[in-house]
């Protein structure tokens, strides 16, 4: 288990460089965040649709003190098959500048090109639309698969704050 965690920390730069992949997507999730947990089916759908097309996905658990066992239980409970990693030291949070869960960060050749919401289903905490009307992350992924050039963009993610490290 320790070897896996060390490998994940040691390969941060390599992961974000997207060698051979069209993009790397970090999906920041919180095990205790209701908004984040409600997005599990959508995140899994995006993974199943875009990973065969060259998009590399990782669930990122930024919770200090979270364990590999707790991460695996959460993944199982919510039906995730997306590869996951712990980010208790906030290396990925810092690199992406993520502040809430759920949030997505998309990197192409090591450059952050998107940070923000999955879609616009949540307008604010406690205020949700029945269905999303704008699918921000999916638009970015479709453009990456098509090889379109993109400028960096950011949207406001709604969810639970990522706890600061003391």
Predicted region positions:
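Short active-site neighborhood of thiol/selenol oxidoreductases, capturing the structured segment around
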Residues: 19-34, 141
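Structural recognition of the beta-strand scaffold that forms the well-ordered cores
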Residues: 24-27, 56-61, 83-86, 115
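Structural microenvironment flanking redox-active thiols in thiol-disulfide oxidoreductases
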Residues: 37-78, 86-95
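Soluble non-cytosolic domains of exported or imported proteins
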Residues: 23, 34-37, 65, 131-135
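Thiol/selenol-based redox catalytic cores and closely related redox-interacting motifs
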Residues: 89-165
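Loop/turn elements at helix/coil->beta-strand transitions in domains of secreted/extracellular proteins
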Residues: 21-24, 53-57, 80-82, 101, ...
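Second-shell loop/turn segments in exported
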Residues: 30-34, 59-64, 126-130
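N-terminal "domain-start" segment that seeds a small globular fold
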Residues: 2-21, 28
């Amino acid at each position: 288990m320790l070897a896996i965690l060390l490998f994940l920390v040691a390969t941060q730069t390599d992961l974000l460089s997207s060698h051979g992949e069209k993009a790397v997507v970090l999906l920041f999730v919180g095990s205790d965040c209701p908004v984040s947990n409600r997005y599990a089916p959508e995140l899994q759908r995006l993974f199943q649709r875009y990973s065969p097309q060259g998009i590399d996905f990782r669930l990122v658990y930024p919770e200090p003190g979270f364990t590999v066992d707790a991460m695996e239980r959460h993944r199982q409970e919510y039906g995730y098959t997306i590869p996951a990693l712990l980010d208790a030291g906030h290396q990925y949070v810092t690199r992406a500048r993520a502040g809430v869960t759920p949030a997505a960060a998309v990197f192409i050749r090591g450059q952050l090109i998107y940070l923000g919401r999955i879609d616009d289903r949540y307008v604010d905490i406690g205020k949700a639309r029945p269905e999303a009307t704008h699918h921000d992350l999916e638009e970015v992924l479709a453009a990456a698969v098509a090889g379109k050039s993109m400028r960096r963009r950011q949207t406001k993610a709604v969810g639970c704050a990522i706890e600061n490290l003391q």
